[in-house]
Amino acid sequence: MKSRDEIISLLRRYKPTAQEKYGISKLGIFGSVARGEQTPDSEIDVCYEGLAPSFLTLDMIQSELEQLLGSKVDLVRVRDNMNSLLRQRILRDGIYV
């Protein structure tokens, strides 16, 4: 697994593409990678803000991120009406690029 700094750097480079292609306004990581507690088997938790994509588009974004980061990605859209515990974790641990 790549380091937290490598993941952040890769996401920074990907963000302009995500903004243009998918309407993503904010992109970041949260969870074990953001806290520096990841293991070789950890998924990379990626959060984003922006337009709500279709399931097909969401799958495309996830595939692009998994290829870019070389790991399984769990992709979560941050919004007001989401699970409050998950939202709190993202707000607490999240690192936006």
Walk through the language-model features, giving the residues of each.
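Conserved histidines in hydrophobic membrane contexts and catalytic metal-binding motifs
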Residues: 29
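Catalytic core of pol beta-like nucleotidyltransferases
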Residues: 1-26, 34-40, 50-97
